[in-house]
Amino acid sequence: MILVIDVGNTNTVLGVYQDETLVHHWRLATSRQKTEDEYAMTVRSLFDHAGLQFQDIDGIVISSVVPPMMFSLEQMCKKYFHVTPMIIGPGIKTGLNIKYDNPKEVGADRIVNAVAAIELYGYPAIVVDFGTATTYCLINEKKQYAGGVIAPGIMISTEALYHRASKLPRIEIAKPKQVVGTNTIDSMQSGIFYGYVSQVDGVVKRMKAQAESEPKVIATGGLAKLIGTESETIDVIDSFLTLKGLQLIYKKNV
């Protein structure tokens, strides 16, 4: 079995693969302060509930956009799993040709998503990832990572309304009953929900106009199902795209 770990700014997602099958997965709040021992105790609790033991894991692969966490995570892997983890970054084979001005600027999560999209859905493709930031990545018909778009995430915008507008409450992100709200909460939910649906469709349509052929659009991330089901442009919703990409990259490098 292999353990795949996707460390995002808001959430950390873990999965366990048995060959090609994702048999367990968990979503945790990202914590920058934990030691390797604290991480190990968290993972042990999850494993106990799933009937797993540390020695069941033969390999570990990590994608992270939070550098301060990496030392503790690496030490946890070595101390408790007796495994040196594979870290997505320079020197790791992905098969991806990145056409960014500076390829080092492309986040590990975006690389992993692109690899998964190519392998599972073909190319050209656009990957929309609803994370702390909402990212859009274009893989062109030459199988190249052609570039993308980065926008504020849904949670960032929602929290900004709450913190910067003194009379507006903190709200749950949900699809409202109708577009025109008749109270503050419904109106805010409508603005957030339909505003982001419209953002996705607008950005994707403009990216498609720049592409040389028609790309398939894949959505992933914590809010992919909520926004993706209302979108006119999203073709596939794959909540586990990043975990699948980590497993695919691990296979390419062992």
UniProtKB/Swiss-Prot annotation:
Main subcellular location: cytoplasm
Quote the protein name from its UniProt record. Type III pantothenate kinase
**Residues forming the catalytic site:** 109 (proton acceptor)
**One term of GO molecular function:** pantothenate kinase activity
Annotated positions binding ATP:
6-13, 132
Whichever gene encodes this chain, its name is: coaX
Catalyzed reaction equations: (R)-pantothenate + ATP = (R)-4'-phosphopantothenate + ADP + H(+)
**Which spans of this chain does the record mark as coiled coil?**
none
Q: Which cofactor does it need?
A: NH4(+); K(+)
Q: Which organism is it from?
A: Halalkalibacterium halodurans (strain ATCC BAA-125 / DSM 18197 / FERM 7344 / JCM 9153 / C-125) (Bacillus halodurans)
The metabolic or biological pathway listed in the UniProt record of this protein is: Cofactor biosynthesis; coenzyme A biosynthesis; CoA from (R)-pantothenate: step 1/5
Q: Which PANTHER family match?
A: TYPE III PANTOTHENATE KINASE (PTHR34265:SF1)
Provide the residue positions that the database annotates as binding substrate.
100, 107-110, 184
Supply the alphabetized keyword list: ATP-binding, Coenzyme A biosynthesis, Cytoplasm, Kinase, Metal-binding, Nucleotide-binding, Potassium, Transferase
Task: Look up the record and give one Gene Ontology term from the biological process aspect.
Answer: coenzyme A biosynthetic process
The entry assigns this protein to a family as follows:
Belongs to the type III pantothenate kinase family.
